[in-house]
Amino acid sequence: MHMQLLRNDGVVIFDRTDFGKSNLSLPNGKCRNDLSEGALKVDCSAHSVEYDVSSNKFRALMVQTNVWCFSGAITPDGKLVQTGGFNDGERWQEIPNGLAARKWYATNHILPDGRLIIVGGRRQFNYEFNPKNIAANTFNLPFLLETNDKGEENNLYPFVFLNVDGNLFIFANNRAILLDYMKNKVVKTYPTIPGGDPRSYPSTGSAVLLPLKNLKMADLQAEVLVCGGAPKGSFAQASQGNFTKALKTCARITITDPNPKWVMETMPLARVMGDMILLPNGKVLLINGAGSGSAGWELGRNPVLSPVLYRPDRKIGSRFKTQIPTTIPRMYHSSATLLRDGRVLVGGSNPHAFYNFTSVLFPTELSLEAFSPTYLDSKFNDLRPKIITPKSMSGIRYNKRTNIQVVITGKVAENLVSATMLAPAFNTHSFFMNQRLLVLGNDKVTTCGNSAYNIEVTTPSTHNFAPPGFYLLFVVHQNIPSQGIWVKLR
């Protein structure tokens, strides 16, 4: 249901605690005692694991409260903070008074000052901060009430991105605003996506802030891409056994434009509950989901097995490329995350109210698999950079010249060498919270001999471009990325 890559290359995977007994026991005879649970009052099975990618092993984690449909983010010091959840999980127990309101289906984002903002949630038309340096209250956001469709909602898990001017782009249902969250003021209202169909849960599409480039320009542009979803009324129709075909369109908008307009594109495959993942070379991967129905228990049909690559720098009509399909349906409550080696880890799928492994259309799926983008093909090994320095976990500062030394064994095209920085995202319900890719480019490439090269780059100049914290740093040569290393921007 939820997935987060950590700076130790572990992946934390969460599931709700009230499904009943899982297939993994807690260690050392531990059990969770909770009289509020509907399935098991005493549960000795695990509902969360940490997966070690390098060793292909996992360990059970014990969660104290129900993390069903909660939200999360990595703080600047590298800690995973989870907010909200269901039942007892709605109340922050581990950090007293961490939330002023119960949050379920909310969205988190790291702010330029390192705090978390928590936006929306079921019946929560507001936002709040964590930690709190002012009164422990919420701030009303009427936009979330205005985008709430009666009987369907269609505005849960809103798509939230930090704009380059420091304001928040917030998309819910079929439209968006730009919010000055410090003044609680809407500074821009964006047009409705043409057609007016919803893109937010349960008509679940996905969205990304496209890679930020040309970071030294005074008028840096930022673009958002929203893809997939379900036509209005799909949730109600699916609840009655009528599974409407998912949306086949994407909408792209320059959110920094003084007169922004959505530009529509058509995907090769209709998709609801799909995930959109930024790859280190600046491409976008669309993966998982269904071809009809909506999000929710038993409401999706026609699994979309083929991932699709979106190439944002190409002309309209040539941006999408269908990839090799999987054989495993990844429906409601599936998840994914980019790994440091450039693969995409995909796991889960459970459209049932409990664990159900047999005699159903889409059984509960516990497997993990890795999707390998074409840039990992061995035929590109001579083009693939290998980072020598800096070492992993190095600290870097804002607006500083930084040297990266790499080895590239093949012929080097210096104008096609670039460094990128990717913020690790918290994935749930087809959205990657805090996902962000910055293209640092290269200021200068110097040959050092023996296939070694020094690449000089300039780090982001402001916290508005890149909030402080841990990032994966890649070097990309002719669209072929190196393995990433962890760096801490401060």
Question: Which residue stretches match the model-derived regions?
Answer:
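Beta-propeller and closely related beta-sheet repeat lectin domains
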Residues: 1-4, 9, 37, 46, ...
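Immunoglobulin-like IPT/TIG beta-sandwich domains and homologous Ig-like subdomains
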Residues: 10-26, 30, 38, 46-50, ...
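Beta-propeller blade signature
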Residues: 37, 43-55, 90-93, 124-138, ...
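Short loop/turn motifs that recur once per blade in beta-propeller domains
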Residues: 40, 61-67, 95-103, 144-153, ...
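Asp-box/WD-like beta-propeller blade repeats and closely related beta-sheet repeat scaffolds
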Residues: 90-155
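Beta-propeller domains
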Residues: 149-294
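Conserved blade-ending motifs and adjacent loop-strand segments that build the rim/top face
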Residues: 193-203, 260-275, 303-306, 313-339, ...
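Beta-strand/beta-sandwich contexts
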Residues: 378-417, 486-490
